[in-house]
Regions:
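Short alpha-helical segment of the dimerization/phosphotransfer core of two-component systems
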Residues: 20-25
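Short alpha-helical Gxxx[C/S/T] motif in the catalytic ATP-binding
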Residues: 156, 161, 165
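Helix-loop junction within the histidine kinase core
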Residues: 36-47
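Short conserved segment of the HATPase_c
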Residues: 132-144
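Conserved catalytic submotifs in the C-terminal HATPase_c
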Residues: 46-51, 68, 73-82
Length: 195
């Protein structure tokens, strides 16, 4: 219908809005189902040797237009290659949720850094949004919790993204937390390089 030339601009706009909202609803349902699967051990991981640098670059490219649309500077620092034994789908969901969250809450920039220390793969995603108070830094990883304050613009969402990301990190025998910083919001993912 959208491709039809006989559709008026108003109807085309309405149809595009409906399609966008349908996709958002579908994404929400899929996130809720994924979260439920992680809680009931129904989410099966398939560990494979993967170039995480390449996977991160591909995910970064998907989110770059969204960041640009919001006027955000999005930077990435990654080695040419960094191999680890991961579930590609699960890790992509973790990264996507961290970037979605950063884009929603950032004011001017998002910095992504991938590196390794010892036998750990580390990924940090930092943004300059309103700094989350120390007492809320564990709360935001609970399902359906969002940090809100009177000065923060209204941000759409359900509060399931960080809960799903942490659950997937734990299934990878890893961790996802906020680093101690009073200057910005930095989320740190730590996963074993090998399983």
């Amino acid at each position: 219908v959208l491709a039809s030339q006989s559709v008026s601009d108003d109807i085309r706009d309405d149809l595009e809005t409906m399609e966008l909202n349908t996709n958002r609803l579908l994404d929400l349902v899929n996130q809720l189902l994924d979260f439920r699967k992680t809680e009931t051990q129904g989410f099966q991981l398939n560990f494979v040797e993967c170039d995480v640098s390449e996977l991160l670059q591909k995910t970064y490219k998907r989110f770059k237009p969204l960041a640009r649309e919001r006027g955000l500077a999005l930077s990435i620092e990654t080695p040419e290659s960094l191999y680890a034994s991961v579930d590609r789908e699960g890790l992509t969901k973790i990264i996507s949720n961290l970037l979605t969250n950063a884009i929603k809450y950032s004011e001017t920039y998002i910095r992504i850094r991938l590196y390794s220390e010892g036998e750990r793969l580390l990924l940090s995603v930092c943004n300059d949004g309103l700094v989350i108070p120390v007492e809320m830094r564990e709360e935001i990883f609970k399902p359906f919790i969002q940090y809100k304050t009177g000065t923060l613009r209204s941000v759409p969402g359900t509060g399931i993204g960080l809960a799903l990301a942490r659950s997937l990190a734990e299934l990878h025998e890893g961790t996802l937390c906020m680093e101690d910083s009073m200057e910005n919001n930095c989320f740190l993912l730590s996963l074993p390089l090998r399983h």
